[in-house]
Amino acid sequence: ISKEWAQSMIDDWGRDNDWVRVNVLGLFPRAGEDKLLGPGDVMLAEQRDAPRAAFVEEAIVWGLDVARFGSDASVLRKRQGPIAFRGYTFRNLDGVKLANRVSLIIQRDMLDGARRPDALVVDQTGVGASAFDHLKLLGWGDVIIGCDFGESADDAERFADKRAEMWWRMAKWTKTVGCLPSNSAVLGGELCAPTFKFAKRGKHTAFVLESKDDMKARGVGSPDDADALAMTFYSDLWMRRNYVPEHAAGAATRHVTDA
């Protein structure tokens, strides 16, 4: 491996990270680790909070993960800088009905004082294609971005696909400045669920996130809520870099609801 790649791994995860210890430093792990996030990371993120001044000028990004199968849920998540806001879960809706519900929720958010979103990232595979098209017809065409989890990452040398890249960014955010809802049991469990590995891609070693299908094969449910939050990291331009969070109880307004 190159010195540049090794240093980037140390910079991202620190020398105490078990994966770095084994694969970069050649040391024994302190504990088995093939997960991006652990329960401790989630707990700390749930305990953080941020004053309004820390996020009010940050980009408002919504992520919509669209259900693929009957047992899956469609989930809408909003993030603004270090804050992950309330989430909405939908079941048994076709693309048009889902788009209508999403549009109403965002409009209601704006009526409550929020700015128009800077981006609405929508899973446009399968049923998602219908929701994506209808959201454009409903007037969100200037902010909507279609996402295919299998598309090429911005940094294709380091990440196997876009989903892996978004989860990597989300994990860094969670470990550093991210403020998760204090009652996010479902989201927290999903954030800790997928495994990862590193695989050779030509001359480079790429980060590979466990697929939803592989998770289901080992009896783990689809991380729909976590995927929705990950989609708010579609672009690294929306990641807050300079904010140092205060440790406090999670804000009551950042809760998960079913819609």
Locations of regions flagged by a protein language model:
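ATPase catalytic-site recognition across NTP-hydrolyzing enzymes
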Residues: I1-L64, K78, K200-H204
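A residue-level signal for conserved active-site and pocket-lining positions in enzyme catalytic cores
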Residues: V24, M170, A228
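Short, flexible loop/turn elements at secondary-structure junctions
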Residues: F28, R68, Q124-G126
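Short, flexible loop/turn motifs enriched in small residues
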Residues: E57, R68-V75
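Charge-patterned, long linear interaction tracts outside catalytic cores
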Residues: G63, A185-H247
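A general structural motif
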Residues: V66-F69, G95
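Short beta-strand scaffold segments in enzyme catalytic cores
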Residues: S74-K78, L229
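Mg2+-dependent endonuclease catalytic cores in nucleic-acid-processing enzymes, primarily RNase H-like
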Residues: R77-F207, E246-A259
